[in-house]
C-alpha cells in the first residue's frame, strides 16, 4: 500500500485538501464543490459544478427494492449499519463495471446516502414513507435538513405523501453550519483508521462498494476521526450547568475514565466549527427569547423582570457554555484539546438533528474522501499489508486432550438467544 498521497495534508498550520486551506474552503466554498475537488483533483468550473450537482441530485431517488430493504431494518439498528447495508445492497443491483465505474458509484452513494438515512429513520420511527426528492436548486446541506424535517406530522397530507411545497425552509445558518461540518469531515488523511481501511481494501483490487463498506464499519468505532460526535453528545447532555460539568468531568478524570472528543494534538478544524456552534447558540437564544416575549405580552413588569433573569440563567447553562467549560477543564487538567467531533456534536444538536444520527453524518461526508483515496490507491500500487511482531509462545508439542489442564473459564453461548 502506498505511503504517498496528494489528497490531504495535515500540519500545525492547517489542513489542506488538494493544496487548498480548509479555512478558505469552509468560508467560501460548498460541500459539493469540495467533494468534486477531492474526487476529481481540481476545483470545478461553473459548468462542471452545475453538472456535478445535477448528478448528485439525480441519485436522491432510491429504488423501490432498496426501500423494501430499509423498511425491514428495525429502529434499534445503528444508522451506520443502515448505510453499510445500503452500500452492500447497491453492490448487488448495480455492481462496479466499465460502464458503472467508480465515479458514477461515488455520485450514487454520496447523492443517495441522506435519502437512505432519512427514509429508514422516519419509517422505523413512525411508519412514514417520505419522498426523498426536494427542490432541484437545494444544496446538499439544505436537502439534508429538509429530509430531516419531513418526519413532522404537520408536513404529511392525507395520502401519507409529501410535496416539496410543504417543506419547512431550514434556517440559513443551520444550512451553512451543516455545510461547514460536511466540509470539515470530508477528509483527514490516511492517519484515520477508516481511510487506512479503504486504502488497504483498494490495494487488494477489491470493488469500490467493498472498500467503502470496510470504511463505514471502521467509522462506527468511537476512536476513529468522525465517529465520536454521538458519544460526545451523550457525555454533554446530562450536564445541567458549568458547575455540574466541573463535578462530572473531574470525577471521570479522577476515575481514569476516557473522555471522548479530546486529543493530545490541536485539531485545526475545531476553531472553525466552534465558531459556528457559538453562532447557532446565539440564534437559538434569540428565537427562545422572542417566543418568551410573545408568551409574556400580558404579564406585568415584575413578571417580565423575572423572566429576563430566567433567560440570563438559561444562557449561563446553555449547551455552548457547558461545552466551553468542559473544554477548559480538559485543557487545564490534562492539557488535551477538543477535536472536531466535540463541537460538531453541539452544532448538530442545536440544529435539531437527533443524536442517533450524528455519526452517520460523518460517514456521508467522509465518503468523498474515501472515494478519492480509493482512486489514488488503485493508481499507485498493489496489495501491501502492515507487518506484525509475533509475541506468542515458542514452539510447543501438541498435548493429548486427556492430558490438558483446564484453566479457561469457557462457556458455550446459549443458541436460543
Swiss-Prot record:
For this UniProt entry, the molecular function terms from Gene Ontology, in alphabetical order, are: 2-methylcitrate synthase activity; citrate (Si)-synthase activity
**Region (Disordered) location:** 284-317
- Superkingdom classification of source: Eukaryota
InterPro entries xrefs: Citrate_synth-like_lrg_a-sub (IPR016142), Citrate_synth-like_sm_a-sub (IPR016143), Citrate_synthase (IPR002020), Citrate_synthase_sf (IPR036969)
Q: Name one GO cellular component term.
A: mitochondrial matrix
Q: Where is the composition biased (Low complexity)?
A: 286-309
Q: What Gene Ontology biological process does one annotation of this record name? A: carbohydrate metabolic process
Q: Which residues form a coiled coil?
A: none
Query: Which SUPFAM superfamilies does this entry report, sorted A to Z?
Result: Citrate synthase (SSF48256)
**Family note:** Belongs to the citrate synthase family.
Entries under PANTHER family matching the protein: CITRATE SYNTHASE (PTHR11739), CITRATE SYNTHASE-RELATED PROTEIN DDB_G0287281 (PTHR11739:SF25)
- The molecule here is called Citrate synthase-related protein DDB_G0287281
Amino acid at each position: 500500500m502506498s505511503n504517498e498521497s496528494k489528497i490531504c495534508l495535515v500540519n500545525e498550520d492547517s489542513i489542506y485538501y488538494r493544496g487548498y486551506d480548509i479555512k478558505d474552503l469552509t468560508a467560501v466554498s460548498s460541500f459539493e464543490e469540495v467533494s468534486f475537488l477531492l474526487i476529481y483533483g481540481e476545483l470545478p468550473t461553473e459548468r462542471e459544478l452545475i453538472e456535478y450537482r445535477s448528478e448528485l441530485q439525480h441519485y436522491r431517488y432510491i429504488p423501490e427494492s432498496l426501500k423494501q430493504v430499509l423498511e425491514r431494518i428495525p429502529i434499534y439498528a445503528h444508522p451506520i449499519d443502515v448505510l453499510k447495508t445500503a452500500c452492500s445492497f447497491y453492490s448487488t443491483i448495480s455492481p462496479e463495471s466499465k460502464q458503472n465505474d467508480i465515479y458514477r458509484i461515488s455520485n450514487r452513494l454520496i447523492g443517495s446516502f441522506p435519502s437512505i438515512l432519512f427514509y429508514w429513520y422516519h419509517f422505523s420511527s413512525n411508519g412514514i414513507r417520505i419522498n426523498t426528492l426536494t427542490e432541484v436548486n437545494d444544496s446538499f446541506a439544505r436537502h439534508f435538513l429538509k429530509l430531516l424535517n419531513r418526519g413532522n406530522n404537520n408536513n404529511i397530507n392525507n395520502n401519507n405523501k409529501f410535496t416539496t411545497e410543504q417543506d419547512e425552509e431550514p434556517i440559513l445558518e443551520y444550512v451553512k453550519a451543516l455545510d461547514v461540518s460536511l466540509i470539515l469531515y470530508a477528509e483527514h488523511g490516511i492517519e484515520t483508521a477508516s481511510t487506512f481501511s479503504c486504502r488497504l481494501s483498494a490495494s487488494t483490487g477489491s470493488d469500490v462498494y467493498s472498500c467503502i463498506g470496510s470504511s463505514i464499519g471502521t467509522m462506527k468505532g468511537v476512536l476513529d476521526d468522525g465517529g465520536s460526535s454521538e458519544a460526545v453528545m451523550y457525555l454533554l447532555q446530562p450536564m445541567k450547568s458549568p458547575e455540574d460539568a466541573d463535578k462530572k468531568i473531574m470525577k471521570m478524570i479522577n476515575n481514569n475514565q476516557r473522555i471522548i472528543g479530546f486529543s493530545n494534538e490541536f485539531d485545526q478544524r475545531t476553531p472553525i466549527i466552534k465558531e459556528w456552534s457559538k453562532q447557532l447558540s446565539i440564534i437559538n437564544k434569540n428565537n427562545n427569547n422572542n417566543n418568551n416575549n410573545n408568551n409574556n405580552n400580558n404579564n406585568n413588569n415584575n413578571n417580565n423582570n423575572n423572566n429576563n433573569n430566567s433567560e440570563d440563567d438559561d444562557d449561563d447553562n446553555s449547551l455552548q457554555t457547558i461545552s466551553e467549560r468542559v473544554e477548559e477543564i480538559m485543557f487545564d487538567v490534562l492539557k488535551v484539546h477538543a477535536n472536531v467531533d466535540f463541537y460538531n456534536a453541539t452544532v448538530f444538536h442545536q440544529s435539531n438533528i437527533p443524536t442517533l444520527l450524528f455519526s452517520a453524518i460523518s460517514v456521508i461526508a467522509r465518503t468523498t474522501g474515501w472515494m478519492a483515496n480509493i482512486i489514488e490507491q488503485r493508481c499507485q500500487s498493489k496489495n501491501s499489508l502492515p507487518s506484525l511482531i509475533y509475541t506468542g509462545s515458542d514452539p510447543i508439542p501438541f498435548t493429548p486432550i486427556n492430558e490438558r489442564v483446564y484453566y479457561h473459564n469457557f462457556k458455550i453461548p446459549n443458541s436460543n438467544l
